[in-house]
Amino acid sequence: MAKNKIAYVCTECGGQSTKWQGQCPHCMTWNTMVESIIEASVPNRYASLTQTSELKKLNEVKMSAVYKRTTCISEFDRVLGGGFVPGGVVLIGGDPGIGKSTLLIQALSHMTNDKTQAACKVIYVSGEESPQQIAMRAKRLELEVSDIFILSEINLEKIIQSIEKNKPDVVVIDSIQTIYSEELQSAPGSVTQVRECSAQLTRIAKQLEVSMILVGHVTKEGSLAGPRVLEHIVDTVLYFEGDQNSSFRMVRAFKNRFGAVNELGVFAMTEKGLREVTNPSALFLSHHHEEVSGSCITVTQEGTRPLLIEIQALVDNAHGASPKRLGVGLEQNRLSMLLAVLHRHGGIACFDQDVFVNAVGGVKITEPGVDLAILCAIVS
């Protein structure tokens, strides 16, 4: 019998190395190599999981209209591209306590009680919370959850067996980092376990046309924990953003095969759960009774939605050898580049001044068209 071996696997690209290195030799990222057990090759391990497929011409493939099951939460449906697609796999990541489970239990409740759609059978697989905790949350939110089935299980084989037996329409896995397969000896949450469990759940979703929702953890840098290949396996990648000190939450689509990328949904956390914000521009603007310096309002495009956002800037004399460059919602390197452009082409030097830039509401600025508003706020 072949023995397992120890190797170092990159959490970003999944590349392997026989020894630890500070920089991944495959994708050149730093501090991403972690120790992992490489499973011994077992012949025909996945033979029972595959189905034979015949060769077909592309023009002979029968096409049918894609039916999207809406969540009855317009902001969430906007980010998803209209709703959940049968056979589609959605990955939702966010900080602990940001509201991922709350949003999903609200969406599932609306879907199972929506009389305008076909009946929806839902299985909520919880690997972190007990059924009692989930029931308490649903009661606190005053949700009707009589048609939602709870499965407290972290074994992949048992989860797949339950899905094949009950034939649900929607399955939620909370979270993918807690699931493990008996075929692998590594611990739950390891690179190997996350990759293989995600691949098998994706396979069963495509095979049975089940809408699969995977909840993922994020690292301290804000990226999804686990191998980068996880984001390539799924159809849609959503990030739950927001400040823990603020009641507002944002769901952003970073990848979507069935909708627009960079689409943004805005919510407000209340005692009764997440509430939609129908006018997000009001969130990203501060109200002044008179004109103030260091503020500029601009329009940015988030997916298919134009938004009004306010850029605030503060410039002060530096008291150290190296002036500070700090941007909230803006990358520091981008801010440094804009200050260099301002100095070179505008004749305004900030080399002896601290510069602080903030986007009201915590929105992340990615569109280059906002650069002019940033410079106007700094100059004013």
Where are these regions (language model features)?
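Phosphate-binding/switch region of NTP-binding enzymes
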Residues: T202-H289
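Extended interfacial segments that mediate partner engagement and assembly in macromolecular machines
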Residues: I38-K115, C120-R137, S146-E153, Q312, ...
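Conserved nucleotide-binding/hydrolysis micro-motifs of P-loop NTPases
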Residues: T32, P96-I98, E128-Q132, R140-L143, ...
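Conserved P-loop NTPase/AAA+ ATPase motor core
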Residues: E263-G265, E271-S380
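Short metal-coordination and nucleic-acid-contact micro-motifs, chiefly zinc-binding Cys/His arrays
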Residues: N4-I6, W20
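Short cysteine-rich clusters marking metal-coordination/redox-active sites
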Residues: C10-C13, C24-C27
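Conserved inter-motif catalytic segment of the P-loop NTP-binding fold
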Residues: G87, D95, Q106-A107, M111-Q200, ...
